Each structure stands twice: as C-alpha cells, then as structure tokens.
C-alpha cells in the first residue's frame, strides 16, 4: 500500500490564516479546490518548499520534507517534485528539445524514471522538439512545461492551475494528456484549480478549501454528493460516476454503462468503446427528476430505482436538494419544494430517478 501524503500547516497572513491537517492518497490525482484566496497555491508552495510554514509537518512517501518542531526543512531541489505553473517558464533562446534536456541533465541516469522519448510521446510533442518556445501556442507551451517537469523524475507532481491561462479550446486539448499521465504513470499529482469541470474530469480525491481552512477532504464521488458543502448549492451541483462499459448498441450508438458495485446501468450517447472500459460521467442535480413509479412512456432513457438518503434547502429557497442512493452510487436531484411535498419525500423512501442528461467526462 502506498504511504499517504501528510500535510499539516499553520501560517498567519494579514488577510487570513492557513490551517490544514491533511492525509492525502499517495497515488492518483488529488485536487485542491476552492475560490481565489482560499489557500490552494499557498499549500502547494509549502509542499514544494517555496514557502516555509511557521508551523508545519510534511511527509511524502515516508520522507519528511518539513518538521518545524524538530528543525527539519528540506530544500526545494531535494524534494523530488515536478512543479507546473500557470504559464510555462521556458527558455525562449533554446529549442523545445534543449528546454527538456536542461531538466533531464540534472538527474543522474540511474535515477531517471522517465526518458525524453517517453515524455514527448505522453504529451504529444515529438513534432515540436526543434521549434523555439515563441513559435508555440499556449497549449503547446504548457505541454512542454509539463514534460519538462516529468523529466526531473519526480516522486510527486504539483500542478498550480496549469490551464488557467488557456482558452476553452486549448484546455480541451490538454485535458486528455493529463488523463493519459494519470493512467500510464505511477506518479501522484496534487492539482490546484477553481474550475469545477476540470476537477470533476481529473480528480480521484477532492480537498475543498475556503479562507485557508479545509472544509472537506475525501473521494470525489462522495465529496461532491455532500449536502453540507457549498458545492451542492451551486448551479453546477452534481455527482461524478465512474462506471464500466458493458454493452454497445451500434444502431442507436448508445453505450451501456454499469454503475460501480451494482447491476444498475445507464445508457449514454457516445462512440463505441471497448467492453470493460472505465468511463467517467457527470450527472447534474438539475437534470434529475423524481417519480413514484417508473414511467415507461417517456423519452428519458435513464430511470433508476433509488432510495432517499437526505434532503436540504438549496440556495434558491424555492428548491431542495435530495441525496439519493442508486445501488450504492450517490445521486443528487434538485427539485422544487412543492414537488417534494407532493411526493411526500422522506428518508428511506424508494422511488425512481429520471436522468435527463449524462455528460461524459473521460
């Protein structure tokens, strides 16, 4: 079992105090999510050693990087991290190849976990090696920056809003490469963002920060479904589901996706995928309606038997949020208070969730 990443920080600023006590997974992608000024980047910089917490303890894979009580503070260059900033800081007078080799040459050959060819293939930049950075698009520059960070053979990748400076099209170009790194490399990543769509697509674990404090930390599918958190109140409230492709209807071009841990399925309009492929989807609370019985005379494809777990007022007092259990998979529904009363909703009640739309994330 991979050792967790421990981060305990105490830092005082004029505007707010950062206070964290986190045990994060030592594998996969952990997202630090929250509004601007919530302390996301400060936490990342402390983990990197670019800032020193007044009181701090940081341990990564059983190696202590900071222990203020015992006077331990490992310099940034000794922490085996790959740091990706909002904008790639490349040497414009060097080619892409030379930029990548600059980082690679610092790592003794026996300690290299990733070679140049592997990094360029993973990020799709083989054809850019002889170009200068000023001839690259913003998305290409960022992919080169990520490749350069990988070539330092890090034990931990730190990504500080790496897509924030890019437009929607460029973001869409880079996200598949980040997903590929997630699938193919055994390197944990801490990913800072305030964009919920990025987090929903990439993260396995979610840390929600506000004003320097940790509001929640847990697996993304559980954390997004919590009604006591601000995420459930917004218009983008919804859950992430990672199901398994179990069938494909070529005539109607519909995937059948089996929900984890159950026999329940959803059908999703999508190109054909190999049976057994894991598929991540998002179901928005606003796209889920409730019925006391299954309506077979409806255009809605996905109707699932569910049990009511809890209910809470939404930010708009005309609505309520309902947390549901669909065979072990959490769902959220946003309905009017009037509808809740008409259905006589209560904990433990069984009914049908009608899902009007399913968004494929990855």
Curated annotation (Swiss-Prot):
Location of the Mop domain: 297-362
Keywords assigned: ATP-binding, Cell inner membrane, Cell membrane, Membrane, Molybdenum, Nucleotide-binding, Translocase, Transport
EC number: 7.3.2.5
Pfam families named in the record: ABC_tran (PF00005), TOBE (PF03459)
Catalytic activity: molybdate(out) + ATP + H2O = molybdate(in) + ADP + phosphate + H(+)
InterPro entries: AAA+_ATPase, ABC_transporter-like_ATP-bd, ABC_transporter-like_CS, Mo/tungstate-bd_C_term_dom, ModC_ABC_ATP-bd, Molybdenum_import_ModC, Mop_domain, P-loop_NTPase
Any one Gene Ontology cellular component term annotated for this protein: plasma membrane
Ranges for domain ABC transporter: 2-236
Sites where the protein binds ATP: 34-41
Chief location of this protein within or outside the cell: membrane
Recorded topology in the membrane: Peripheral membrane protein
Compartments (UniProt record): Cell inner membrane
Gene Ontology terms, MF aspect: ABC-type molybdate transporter activity; ATP binding; ATP hydrolysis activity
Domain of life the protein comes from: Bacteria
The protein's assembly and partners: The complex is composed of two ATP-binding proteins (ModC), two transmembrane proteins (ModB) and a solute-binding protein (ModA).
Family label: Belongs to the ABC transporter superfamily. Molybdate importer (TC 3.A.1.8) family.
Functional description taken from the UniProt entry: Part of the ABC transporter complex ModABC involved in molybdenum import. Responsible for energy coupling to the transport system.
Full protein name: Molybdenum import ATP-binding protein ModC
Organism: Pseudomonas syringae pv. tomato (strain ATCC BAA-871 / DC3000)
